[in-house]
Design a protein with these regions (language model features):
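Compositionally biased, intrinsically disordered or flexible polar/acidic segments
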Residues: 18-152
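Sec-dependent N-terminal signal peptides
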Residues: 4-13
Length: 152
């Protein structure tokens, strides 16, 4: 029986490698998401200055595990920020920051689409087609009473 338990556990350990390479996105300078840029504000309009509205930021990436670091805070206003990724998976909940205070938080996000290999695809239900975890983008949602983020 022990033989059968070790095989699945070993497989899980091997599949948990994070992607290599680092890219920083400054949100003050970020465009609206487009296929040409491959990153930017997505799903709703980019937030106006001193906005209290939630916003989404997407980056086109291949399937895999990604180590994401967000720098929460703003030079202009205090905030309370919650961060979710893909299909509303909660990673950071209600982190308060004072004006000109910055807090970095890091987490691992797994990003997948429906393509497996060659001609193999995951079959999804019609209601799942609108979900954020079945596209070619890693999408982060910034929410809270006053969501503030300087960079990703």
């Amino acid at each position: 029986m022990k033989k059968y338990l070790w095989i699945p556990l070993l497989g899980l350990g091997l599949s948990a490698t994070a992607q290599t390479g680092t890219k920083t996105y400054l949100l003050d300078e970020a465009p609206r998401y487009s296929e040409e840029t491959g990153y930017g504000y997505d799903l709703v309009a980019p937030p106006a200055k001193d906005s209290k509205s939630p916003f989404f930021f997407s980056v086109r990436v291949p399937d895999g595990n990604y180590k994401v670091t967000v720098r929460l805070g703003s030079r202009k206003q205090a905030g309370i920020t919650t961060v979710r990724a893909e299909s509303r998976r909660l990673f950071i909940e209600s982190v308060p920051t004072k004006k000109k205070e910055f807090i970095e938080r890091t987490f691992i996000v797994n990003k997948r689409n429906t393509h497996i290999d060659g001609n193999e695809y995951v079959r999804i239900k019609p209601r799942e087609k609108r979900k954020l975890n079945w596209d070619d983008k890693l999408t982060l949602e910034f929410n809270g009473s006053v969501p503030v983020c300087e960079s990703i």
